């Protein structure tokens, strides 16, 4: 029965396509939905034979689709989930109460501390107190320039290094050459003012 309905469904689909393509369009192009004719499907008038045939074939197509759905559901009413096999022979996930070993389970044996048993990181070298530096490294201090010069002189004397002292001349920055003197700018302003006065 379902194979006959399926064949009829295919024939109806092909017939609907052919009948719709043979019909004359009710309106042309984009002007179908505007202008004097305000109806959606074109001018209302007596329906032609092709229009009636299209409606009849469409109604048969819908009825055939509903019938196919009903018969397929009746014939193959089983779900895929109904056909899956379940194993009832599975062992329980939680073991019996007497089989737990309290020596290995930290929740049952409070004497075990998981932090004490944690392995150390083999990538990190272990430092002993003998390897620590004797004096901390000197950090630069934020002091006045005079105090910094005194500290540098004292450090140079302690370390035995000569010629480290800075002079005030070395600390100054040389003047830049890209700056223009202001006298030139004032001369040009005076020159432009004279031109304005002449006009």
Swiss-Prot record:
Instruction: Provide ranges: composition bias, Low complexity.
Output: 97-115, 172-188
Q: GO molecular function terms here?
A: protein-transporting ATPase activity
List this protein's GO terms for biological process.
Answer: intracellular protein transmembrane transport; protein secretion; protein transport by the Sec complex
Annotated region Disordered: where? Answer: 92-199
Look up keyword Transmembrane and say if it applies.
yes
Tell me which InterPro entries the record gives: SecG (IPR004692)
**Keyword Protein transport appears in the UniProt entry:** yes
Record field: compositional bias (Polar residues):
118-130
Q: Which UniProt keywords apply?
A: Cell membrane, Membrane, Protein transport, Translocation, Transmembrane, Transmembrane helix, Transport
Q: Where in the cell is it found?
A: Cell membrane
Q: A cellular component term (GO) from this record?
A: plasma membrane
- Give the way it sits in the membrane: Multi-pass membrane protein
Q: Which family does it belong to?
A: Belongs to the SecG family.
NCBIfam families (alphabetical)? secG
- Say what the protein does: Involved in protein export. Participates in an early event of protein translocation.
Q: What's this protein's name?
A: Protein-export membrane protein SecG
Its source organism is Helicobacter pylori (strain ATCC 700392 / 26695) (Campylobacter pylori)
Q: What is the gene name?
A: secG
């Amino acid at each position: 029965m379902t194979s006959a309905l399926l064949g009829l469904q295919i024939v109806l689909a092909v017939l609907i396509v052919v009948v719709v393509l043979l019909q004359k369009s009710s309106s042309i192009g984009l002007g179908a939905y505007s202008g004097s004719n305000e109806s959606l499907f074109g001018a209302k008038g007596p329906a032609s034979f092709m229009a009636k045939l299209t409606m009849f074939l469409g109604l048969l197509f819908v009825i055939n689709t509903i019938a196919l759905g009903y018969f397929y559901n009746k014939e193959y009413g089983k779900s895929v989930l109904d056909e899956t096999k379940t194993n009832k022979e599975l062992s329980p996930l939680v073991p019996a109460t007497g089989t737990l070993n309290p020596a290995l389970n930290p929740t049952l044996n409070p004497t075990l501390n998981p932090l004490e048993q944690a392995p150390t990181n083999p990538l990190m070298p272990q430092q002993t107190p003998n390897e620590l530096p004797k004096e901390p490294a000197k950090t630069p201090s934020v002091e006045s320039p005079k105090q910094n010069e005194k500290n540098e002189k004292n450090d140079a004397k302690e370390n035995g290094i000569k010629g480290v002292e800075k002079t005030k001349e070395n600390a100054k920055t040389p003047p830049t050459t890209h700056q223009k003197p202001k006298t030139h700018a004032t001369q040009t302003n005076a020159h432009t003012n004279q031109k304005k006065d002449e006009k």
